UniProtKB/Swiss-Prot annotation:
GO cellular component: mitochondrial outer membrane; mitochondrion
Role according to the record: Fructose and glucose phosphorylating enzyme. May be involved in the phosphorylation of glucose during the export from mitochondrion to cytosol.
Record protein name field: Hexokinase-4
Keyword ATP-binding set for record: yes
InterPro entries, sorted: ATPase_NBD, Hexokinase, Hexokinase_C, Hexokinase_N
Metabolic or biological pathway, per its Swiss-Prot or TrEMBL entry: Carbohydrate metabolism; hexose metabolism; Carbohydrate degradation; glycolysis; D-glyceraldehyde 3-phosphate and glycerone phosphate from D-glucose: step 1/4
Positions of region (Hexokinase large subdomain): 229-480
Keywords: ATP-binding, Glycolysis, Kinase, Membrane, Mitochondrion, Mitochondrion outer membrane, Nucleotide-binding, Transferase, Transmembrane, Transmembrane helix
Organism annotation: Arabidopsis thaliana
Localisation: Mitochondrion outer membrane
Sites where the protein binds D-glucose: 194-195, 229-230, 256, 284, 315
Membrane topology, as annotated: Single-pass membrane protein
Length: 502
């Protein structure tokens, strides 16, 4: 009996040792996998670093590219497109106008009434709709008929409300958030699609004529009287409320900027049609490129798999369309290197399935258990992850968003440097200037709705400029500014006004 007990005890000890060995091996294996994930995070942080010195080098590079783009066509990655806008709203405009805004993920229709004073601006009707994905790869006829039918329904809702004192033909501003080479304030040809649109036969077509043709087919007595880039609309809205506004930036699905430039600095345009001495320039800065940009392997993968590879590199690092997919790619890589996220789901492997608004929700999750992070991961096919993994995801969101926001700030500072509002004198006649109050209008869901992006960008801009200069620079957020501003610009173009030199 004693011998049996000894044998059982020995066997139990062997089993216990075996179990302990397995558990130790599993823990060691788990630690190795976690170390790999931590290593990937560290690599990401290092690749996304944007120290102040690098940002200031980018500011210089942007200012140089701006100058090159003003000298000759094709002389820069920045197109620096003329808009033929040399007068901006000042509050004296009157009348009722419409605007239709085609953005990267939505379109808006608005009706604006102006009574001759800033305080009398009345936005009477607003409709906002998501753009059906099918339209983004359809034909020009389908796209513009859709827009025309939407505008027709909008006007039919008015009934007899349209003022009899207005001309019979309604005036429409078409806000168009894609690169266009303007030939006048009311016409321009499409250069290329961005933000996921791919309607091939549209390149080189006059955008205003396309919309006008669709309106005419439906018997609508509406004249497309202005073709306006969304940034120019935002600048118009900003200037209407604050004459110190000299630039506008959109951070939404994509990103772009415009600003007021002296006409004598626009060397590629020998005879600009302006008497004001200034013209709004549409930068199309999404295509900016510099060796100083902190590009990662995830950016390279995203670019290679996009419909416009080797194009719009800057926009793909700061645009709302792309931030979510960069975060997704990081999580996917970690899933491939480790099992901390469980089995790799087909959902997580799908490009653009993670939207930037979800990144914002995870990044700003203030619940004790990071429940929003857990919910969104579950939607991606990742369930029951421990707290440390949820915190890891928040950190990934932080790294990607912080980089984007700081690069965005460098873009704004580059504009300020070019126009001599960064304290250095820029390309202006005198390096010694008294700092003037400078307003930059900012629009777009990424800036308006993503608090951490906004805070990181504002902080970086202050760091780049320094406190002495930053106190003179005001970044003003505005909602629907590009749509309303386009209607204001249309009203302004109906009267004889000029904008001050910058």
């Amino acid at each position: 009996m004693g011998k049996v007990l000894v044998m059982l005890t020995a066997a139990a000890a062997v089993v216990a040792c075996s179990v302990a060995t397995v558990m130790v091996r599993r823990r060691m294996k788990g630690r190795r996998k976690w170390r790999r994930v931590v290593g990937l995070l560290k690599d990401l942080e290092e690749a996304c670093e944007t120290p102040l010195g690098r940002l200031r080098q980018m500011v210089d590079a942007i200012a140089v590219e701006m100058q090159a783009g003003l000298v000759s066509e094709g002389g820069s990655k920045l197109k620096m497109l003329l808009t033929f806008v040399d007068d901006l709203p000042n509050g004296s405009e009157t009348g009722t106008y419409y605007a239709l805004h085609l953005g990267g993920s939505y379109f808006r229709i608005i009706k604006v009434h102006l009574g001759g004073q800033r305080s009398s601006l009345e936005v009477q009707d607003v409709e906002r709709h998501s753009i059906p994905t099918s339209l983004m790869n359809s034909t020009s006829e389908v796209l513009f008929d859709f827009l025309a039918s939407s505008l027709q329904r909008f006007i039919e809702k008015e009934g007899n409300d349209f003022s009899l004192s207005q001309p019979l033909k309604r005036e429409l501003a078409f806000t168009f958030s894609f690169p266009v080479k303007q030939t006048s304030i009311s016409s321009g040809v499409l250069i290329k699609w961005t933000k996921g649109f791919a309607i091939s036969e549209m390149a080189g077509e006059d955008i205003a004529e396309c919309l006008q043709g669709a309106l005419n087919k439906r018997g609508l007595d509406i004249r497309v009287a202005a073709l306006v880039n969304d940034t120019v609309g935002a600048l118009s809205f900003g200037h209407f409320h604050d004459p110190d506004t000299i630039a506008a930036v959109v951070f939404g699905t994509g990103s772009n900027a415009c600003y007021l430039e002296r006409t004598d600095a626009i060397i590629k345009c020998q005879n600009p049609r302006t008497t004001s001495g200034s013209m709004v320039v549409n930068m199309e800065w999404g295509n900016f490129w510099s060796s100083r940009l902190p590009r990662t392997s995830y950016d390279l993968e995203l670019d290679a798999e996009s419909m416009n590879s080797n194009d719009m590199g800057f926009e793909k690092m700061i645009g709302g369309m792309y931030l979510g997919d960069i975060v997704r790619r990081v999580i996917l890589r970690m899933s491939q290197e480790s099992d901390i996220f469980g089995p790799i789901s087909s959902i997580l492997s799908t490009p653009f399935v993670l939207r930037t608004n979800s990144v914002s929700a995870m990044h700003e999750d203030d619940t004790s258990e990071l429940q929003e992070v857990a919910r969104i991961l579950k939607d991606l096919g990742v369930s029951e992850v421990p707290m440390k993994v949820r915190k890891l995801v928040v950190k990934i969101c932080d790294v990607v968003t912080r980089r984007a926001a700081r690069l965005a700030a460098a873009g704004i500072a580059g504009i300020l440097k070019k126009v001599g509002r960064d304290g250095s004198g820029g390309g202006r006649r005198s390096d010694k200037q008294i700092m003037r109050r400078t307003v930059v209008a900012v629009e777009g869901g990424l800036y308006l709705n993503y608090r951490m992006f906004r805070e990181y960008m504002d902080e970086a801009l202050r760091d780049i400029l320094g406190e002495d200069v930053a106190q003179h620079v005001v970044v003003k957020a505005m909602e629907d500014g590009s749509s309303i501003g386009s209607a204001l610009l249309l009203a302004s173009s109906q009267s004889v006004q000029t904008i001050p030199s910058v």
